Curated annotation (Swiss-Prot):
Protein name: Glycyl-dTMP PLP-dependent decarboxylase
Catalytic activity annotation: 5-C(alpha)-glycyl-dTMP in DNA + H(+) = 5-aminoethyl-dUMP in DNA + CO2
Keyword Lipid biosynthesis tagged: no
Function in brief: Converts 5-Calpha-glycinylthymidine (Calpha-GlyT) into 5-aminoethyl-2'-deoxyuridine (5-NedU) as a step in the pathway leading to thymidine hypermodifications in the viral genome. As a final result of the pathway of hypermodification, 5-aminoethyl-2'-deoxyuridine (5-NedU) substitutes for about 30% of thymidines in the viral DNA. These modifications probably prevent degradation of viral genome by the host restriction-modification antiviral defense system.
One BP annotation, GO: symbiont-mediated suppression of host innate immune response
The family this protein is said to belong to: Belongs to the pyridoxal-phosphate-dependent aminodecarboxylase family.
Highest taxon, organism lineage: Viruses
Lineage, highest ranks first: Viruses, Duplodnaviria, Heunggongvirae, Uroviricota, Caudoviricetes
Amino acid sequence: MIVNNTPVETYELNGVPILVKREDLCAPLPGPSFSKIRGVVAHIKNRPETTIGCLDTYHSKAGWAVAYVCQQLGKQAVDYWPRFKRDGAADAPRVQQQHARQLGADLVDIPAGRSAILYHTAKKHLRENYHDSYLMPNALKLPESITENAAEAVRTAPHLPDSGTLVISISSGTVAAGVLKGFEEAGLLRNYNVILHMGYSRSQDATREYIEKAAGLTLGDRIKFIDEGYGYADAARDASAPFPCNPFYDLKAWKWLSNPTNLETILDGPIVFWNIGE
């Protein structure tokens, strides 16, 4: 269901070798290729309920991940997804919901709105329509996502340089918290500078606080946030990568790294790019 020890491969940017952690390979098809699924597997395995619900967002693969895990474990998935006005009456207009349906999930659309309201609506619908059910935490902020990604970072540590710069794209920061926790457990974090590239603009202080609390770490001044002002629905433009890369997250970070001016600022040691997934 999950692939551990995903490879570290070397790619070049402007003649500079970049070590890329290929977490896009962590879940084979028909699963979604993003490393947050590590925590989804562990979390659902520990739930006794037979029906597992999940709230999706505009470009989230959360419902797809939950549907994949539920199919593997013999549970029923329910994917709640936001219907925008531009969707009209289209049935499952986005590919991630189509994949969830193919894996056996029930699809329930909710008029798009604020995430907290959508989550409350989904929870109420699930409770009223599905016996023995459970709704996954919003944004899949799972403690298991931290512990499982930390474990993968520890497994990867022997294949990485003893020092350098780590570049990670972040949304909520859950996966990054796990990776940083793993680097700390492996004795690497003290020797690494860390660049957290924000997939969309929001409070850096709140994001740092969440990551530090989730990882049980004090990050200090070696952690640098890069906020290029992206909106949540913005995809990277005029950018490509030589490996599968999510246009809403990792590809933005790769595009930033591809800029020679940005790359020059971190050329004081090896560079590790943690590709969370496609």
